[in-house]
Each structure stands twice: as structure tokens, then as C-alpha cells.
Amino acid sequence: MDMLSLNQLQLNIEKRNLFDLCITFLPSAITYIKGANGSGKSSLLRMIAGIMQPSSGNIYYKNSHINNCIKPYCTYIGHNLGLKLEMTVFENLKFWSEIYNSTETVPAAIHYFKLDYLLDEKCYNLSSGIQKIVAIARLIVCQSDLWLLDEVESNLSKENKDLLNNLIVMKANSGGIILLSSHQENVIKSAQILQLK
């Protein structure tokens, strides 16, 4: 089964244990990660994405340790959006699609987020909210079944928040696993909550 398992996953900072997690996320799960600033929400997502090492414990996805998973096995969007600012919107989408071998998905991402009129714009010319939408369009382009989203709803208009939340629900309905950290209220009522101390 395509589940995500955290096995005694710990993060220790300055002799303080931020969390010690044993939890499994099943396909179609949407999970809000909640907690105060400094509780380890961003670090947890970075660990699952393979960007940061835990202090101890293991992470398994699709029954394989993430160190053994074929990369890229997830789509991670953090505070650093991963945009190539000197490239155009279209060039960024094409770049990601080539990494994930999914070039056929670019038109769907452009259409869903109404990016047609921005395709030739350099990303450094875009507002922070539009830059974020271009980054979020990667969710459609990359076609992975594991989404890790770190406060992606900030700086978005209500319309774009609705588009994002609808996309998350559609991904869950098709068997995806979505983890998102958020300081905002839980808009997706079917989601579960993982509370970090």
C-alpha cells in the first residue's frame, strides 16, 4: 500500500526533543500539521521530503525507506518556492515537468491556475502572491502522490486559496497523501490534525 510511515521520528534541538512521532498516513489522507512557532512543523516536512535528517528514527514511503526511494518521490513546497526567478513562468513549469518526466501535464496546470497571460513573464517581475501560485502549479505538473506543503496558503487571494484547497481534495480523492502546515483555520473539514507540542 502507498502509505507514509514515521517510525520513532525525533528532532532534538539544543538538548530539547521537539517531537517523537510514530504515525502512518494512508492514501487519501489530508493532514494539517499544527503547532506554535518553533514546534518543528517545517522541519518535519523537510525531513519527509529528504531535505533534512532527523535526530533519530526512520521514514518509509510505499514500503521503502525514503533514502531508497526513487527521486523525486514527493512534491515539496516550502518557504523558498524553488522558482528560477530569471526564467519565465512557462520555462519554470517546463523545467519541473522534465524533472518529473511529465511534460504532458503543463497545459493542465496553466489552465487550472489561469496562467495563460503570464507565460512569457520573468518570475522576478511577479508579485509574491503570483510567484506562489506559479510554484503551487507544480502540484499539477509534477504528478507525485505525496504532497508536502509548508504554509502555502499565505499571500494568496481567496480565489487562489479556493483553487488550492479544491486541488488538495481532488488529489486526496485520487489516493494521494497531503501534509500541510498552516497557522490558518482548517478549511478542509475532512482533514485530520497532527498537533506538535
Curated annotation (Swiss-Prot):
Q: Give the enzyme's main class according to its UniProt record, as a single word.
A: translocase
For this entry, the protein name equals Cytochrome c biogenesis ATP-binding export protein CcmA
Job description of the protein: Part of the ABC transporter complex CcmAB involved in the biogenesis of c-type cytochromes; once thought to export heme, this seems not to be the case, but its exact role is uncertain. Responsible for energy coupling to the transport system.
Keyword Membrane (UniProt): yes
Mind telling me which Pfam families this protein's record contains? ABC_tran (PF00005)
Query: What is one GO biological process annotated to this record?
Result: cytochrome complex assembly
Q: Which reaction does it catalyse?
A: heme b(in) + ATP + H2O = heme b(out) + ADP + phosphate + H(+)
Family indicated by similarity: Belongs to the ABC transporter superfamily. CcmA exporter (TC 3.A.1.107) family.
Listed PROSITE patterns: ABC_TRANSPORTER_2, CCMA
Per the record, the major location class is membrane
**GO CC annotations on file:** plasma membrane
Recorded superkingdom: Bacteria
Quote the record's binding site residues for ATP: 35-42
Instruction: Cite the ABC transporter domain residue spans from the record.
Output: 1-196
Gene Ontology MF terms: ABC-type heme transporter activity; ATP binding; ATP hydrolysis activity
Q: What Enzyme Commission number(s) appear in the record?
A: 7.6.2.5
Name where it's found: Cell inner membrane
Which terms are listed as keywords in the entry?
ATP-binding, Cell inner membrane, Cell membrane, Cytochrome c-type biogenesis, Membrane, Nucleotide-binding, Translocase, Transport
Q: Which Gene3D superfamilies does the entry link to?
A: P-loop containing nucleotide triphosphate hydrolases
Q: Give the membrane topology, semicolon-separated if more than one.
A: Peripheral membrane protein
SUPFAM superfamilies recorded for this chain? P-loop containing nucleoside triphosphate hydrolases
The annotated subunit structure for this chain is:
The complex is composed of two ATP-binding proteins (CcmA) and two transmembrane proteins (CcmB).
Gene name, Swiss-Prot/TrEMBL: ccmA
